[in-house]
Regions:
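Sec-dependent N-terminal signal peptides
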Residues: 3-12
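N-terminal module-boundary/linker segments of secreted carbohydrate-active enzymes
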Residues: 19-57, 269, 274, 278-281, ...
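Short hydrophobic segments within beta-strands
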Residues: 34-36, 67, 156
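Conserved SGNH/GDSL esterase-like catalytic core that processes O-acyl groups on lipids
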Residues: 42-132
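Alpha-helical cap/lid subdomain in secreted, periplasmic
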Residues: 102-228, 237, 243
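Conserved catalytic region of serine esterases and O-acyltransferases that act on ester linkages
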Residues: 219-222, 226-299
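Residue-level detector of functionally pivotal "anchor" positions at catalytic/ligand-binding pockets or at interdomain
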Residues: 294-320
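C-terminal tail/sorting-segment detector
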Residues: 331-345
Length: 345
């Protein structure tokens, strides 16, 4: 996992949309956004600079950075702050570049950030006790150290994993447990700005855009293309739209957003045919961060054909030869052939 994280750290600076060589302190008039977390922060913010540019924000008028560490929890970041440690990985995602020196968390927060985004480590995201007292401590710390008294503190509700991941939470039940935890802790702490990334992804998993790895590229991290773009849209609509006054959902995706091709590993491309489905999943999550769309919200052409023309169904047996009414999770015998049926979510 640490090796994978280091690879992510290496790749993301190569993908930034920033002003190369421009190093200075941030300006008050900029849109300045800081994520504090881990590789999920990188996934969420990867396409955010592109969206800002698409919405007419000049590259020298915004700044997006991620302070990240592999698997870092709220507890980890609180200790980094308390002990005055230098941030190991500070990634420029796009826009103005910060001064190139070692930063402590307190020093970083003295820059005029408009928004600071917090999150819990994925493996602890549904464990209420892991948030206490660290989320409250982090919120108080951001408010105390921030150069802007009106800084917005947002919390990213992260996504559940595919079942191949070493640790959960997994699938729909995992998403639900994350939601219940975030609802309770955000009420306790008084956080009202929630980025519903996990709900966006779970909505997409109920459509024909779902993939064999549940819209991840490795069971954990978001698939390039559709998944990263959808979560970036949720980030933009939650924390950037109040600053720009423009919705990214009012116009089709740019050619740059559609540039990734499916022949690259882990890519689910954005197309003229699927972007409206992506937008609707984002809109639904923005309207109801703790609820999912109906599985029938986006009937596929294939399902419409099946409904219009009933067909003869082959008998289904389990591996012990028992006749089944429906396919069960696991190995089924259909038409004399072994067929693996995954657990549905």
């Amino acid at each position: 996992m640490r090796l994978l994280f280091l690879l992510l750290i290496f790749l993301f600076p190569c993908l930034n949309y920033g002003q190369e060589g421009q190093t200075r302190n941030l300006q008050e008039k900029h849109f300045n956004i800081l994520f504090i977390g881990n590789s999920y922060s990188l996934d969420a913010s990867a396409d955010l600079p592109r969206l800002l540019v698409d919405m007419g924000v000049a590259e020298n008028e915004y700044c997006v950075y991620c302070a990240v560490q592999a698997g870092a929890s709220l507890d980890y970041w609180w200790k980094v702050y308390q002990q005055g440690e230098e941030i190991e990985n500070l990634c420029q995602m796009g826009g103005t570049k910060l001064a190139d020196h070692a930063w402590t968390l307190a020093e970083l927060l003295h820059e005029p950030w408009d928004v600071v985004v917090l999150q819990q480590a994925s493996a602890q995201s549904n464990q209420l006790k892991s948030y206490r007292p660290y989320l409250q401590n982090m919120v108080d710390m951001v408010r105390r150290e921030s150069a802007k008294p009106d800084v917005t503190i947002a919390f990213q509700l992260t996504w559940s994993k595919y079942f191949s991941a070493d640790k959960g939470p997994y699938g729909t039940n995992g998403w639900r447990s994350i939601v219940e935890t975030v609802q309770q802790i955000s009420d306790e702490v008084g956080l009202t700005t929630i980025i519903p990334s996990g709900t966006v992804i779970q909505n997409l998993r109920r459509t024909d855009l779902n993939s064999s790895l549940y819209l991840t590229r490795d069971g954990v991290h978001l698939a390039y293309g559709v998944a990263q773009y959808a979560v970036a849209l949720a980030c933009y609509e939650t924390i950037c739209r109040p600053l720009t006054g423009k919705s990214a959902l009012d116009a089709p995706p740019s050619d740059a957003a559609k540039a990734l091709q499916p022949d690259h590993k882990g890519v689910i491309p954005i197309t003229d045919d699927n972007y409206k489905m992506i937008y609707e999943c984002v809109r639904a999550a923005m309207a109801n961060p703790y609820e999912l769309i109906s599985p029938d919200a986006f009937p596929s052409p294939q399902s419409a054909q099946r409904n219009a023309a009933p067909r003869q169904r082959s008998p289904i047996y389990d591996i012990h030869g028992r006749l089944l009414r429906y396919r069960a999770p696991g190995i089924n015998i259909v038409g004399g052939k072994k067929v693996f049926t995954p657990l549905r979510h």
